[in-house]
Structures are given as C-alpha cells and as structure tokens.
Amino acid sequence: MKITPKPTCAIAYSIQQLGDKWSLLIMRDLVLHKKTRFKELRESKEKIASNILANRLKSLQVNGFIEKLDPTGTKKSTQYIATKKGISSLPIIIELYLFSIHSIDESILDESQKSIKKQIISNRTLFEETRKSEYISFVSSLKEDLNKFKLLAQLN
C-alpha cells in the first residue's frame, strides 16, 4: 500500500487532492462540458488511458469531488457528477485558463473553447456563476430522471 505523506499546508493539501495531470481536466469535463459517462471522459481531446481514468475517478470519488450514480448496477448505466466540493474547483479551472490565455496559440482552440475564452475575458464572475447554476440545474434534472427510472423499474 502506498503511504502518502500528510500535507504541510493548504496548498500542499489542494495539490495532493487535485494536482495530478488528469484530475482538473476530469473536473473541467464534468462541470464545464457536462460529460457524465466514462466513455465521454475517455474520449476527451487529451486521450486519457482507461486505467488512469478509472483510477482518477475513484480518487476523486474517495476525496468527495464526485459522486457515482449507478441506477442499474451496470457499467453502461454509471454516471459521474461533481459534488458541491467538486463544483468548488471551477474557480481553480478558470484561474488556470486565465493563466495560460495569453500564451496559448488560438489556432488550437475549437469554437467552444474560443467562446469560453471570450466569456471569461468579458465577465469572469458572470461566467463562473452562470456555469455553476447551469451545472446544478443539469445535475438536478439528471437525478430526477434517474429517480423516475428507479421508480419505474420497481413497478415492473
């Protein structure tokens, strides 16, 4: 078993939780792009390997950043959503975006990324609050649909 040293400060703690190469990209895909399924996350442009994705999802779940929804107990029905703690990583994602925004070659950005860049530069606070609100509504709707599905399954 790997022994992880206890963090010595708040920044070390945060890096221990989210500082690997993949965790913030997974949180980005969940919160900004509303991806919920393993396959959707695996197919992101960064091409994360399946074993690494599974490991990071488990770590994010254990650390309270995401919740695993599994209505039928099958891999195909499994979805991942950000928790309140996970949604709180959005400002970190935005700050990293702002940190790199002036040095990134815009030709590598797709239309969605260019739109996000424009919105963040225009009004970062509005962008952040709108995205949080949209994601919370999305998750509420998803959970409502899953509850209906479970209820129908019980009736049959």
Q: What residue ranges belong to the model's regions?
A:
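A detector for short, charged/polar N-terminal pre-domain segments
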Residues: 1-9
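Short, contiguous, well-ordered secondary-structure segments
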Residues: 5, 14-17, 29-30, 64-70, ...
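N-terminal helix-turn-helix DNA-binding core of bacterial DNA-binding proteins
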Residues: 9-49
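Basic, amphipathic "hinge/linker" alpha-helix immediately C-terminal to the N-terminal HTH DNA-binding motif
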Residues: 19, 72-96
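A general structural signal marking secondary-structure boundaries and capping sites
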Residues: 34, 64, 100-104
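Residues within the helices of the helix-turn-helix
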Residues: 39, 58, 78
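Canonical helix-turn-helix DNA-binding module
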Residues: 44-75
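C-terminal regulatory/oligomerization modules of transcriptional regulators
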Residues: 91-156
